Amino acid sequence: MTKEEKIDFIIKNKFLFIIRTEDFDGAMKCFDTLVEAGAKVIEFTSTIPNYEKAIKEAKEKVKSEEILVGAGTVLNKELALKAMEGNPDFVVNPTQNFEILEVVPKEKVVFMGGFTPSEIIRNYYAGVDFVKVFPASVLGPKFIKALKFGPLPFVKMLASGGMELGIIEEFIKAGADVIGLGSEVAKVDLVMEGNFSKIKELAKSYLSLLL
């Protein structure tokens, strides 16, 4: 896929599933589970040991399928360079460290955190593809609606943080282009327990909203 095709694919599939754990094997099993559930956009965070290896192995597993695999919690240049070893489809920086843009190739889709209108527009003009609004549940859907139906309709937004099942439709109606799902689905305790059937059930409950 081209970069633009990846952006369209991410928006079309709506949910970005985030795997955050300190267990490499658990992260890989979680990835397999999310794929089985029907997830199409999946992120490995830098908290996972050898997360660049996890990204590379995950991409190899699904190379014949339309599934995007990315790197998350990419806080600085060092982590960005490490992530590039896995050749991720996208990179997520939860803050505003524009230094990572110096080492992330232009063909990669980039998400970057923004909490205020000023931060959000700064991201846009820096060339960021999606602004990650976090914690979205605290700001609420009205915050996103005020921007998307107001001065910033051209900014693509990822709503993440506290995105429980019951509020998803409100955020989508408010204009959120993508919804980030981390501990709402791939809960650390479930990964540690090896309860991947529950993770699959949770993932499917969100994905069913797209049917």
Language-model regions: role of each:
Residues 31, 55, 80, 100-101, ...:
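Generic hydrophobic/aromatic pocket-lining and core-packing "Φ" positions
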Residues 1, 24-25, 115-121, 125, ...:
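Alpha/beta catalytic cores of nucleotide-metabolism and tRNA/nucleoside-modifying enzymes
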Residues 90-100, 133-140, 176-196:
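Glycine-rich phosphate-binding active-site loops on the catalytic face of alpha/beta enzymes
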Residues 20-24, 71-77, 93-96, 112-117, ...:
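Glycine-rich beta-to-alpha transition loops that act as phosphate-gripper elements at the mouths
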Residues 49-51, 78, 99-100, 119-121, ...:
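Short secondary-structure capping/turn micro-motifs that flank functional sites
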Residues 35-40, 62-64, 84-91, 106-111, ...:
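Glycine-enriched alpha-helix->loop->beta-strand junction motifs that scaffold or abut catalytic
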Residues 97-139:
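Histidine/lysine/aspartate-rich catalytic loop segments that bind and position anionic ligands
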Residues 1-87, 165, 173, 193-211:
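Conserved N-terminal beta1-alpha1 strand-loop-helix module at the mouth
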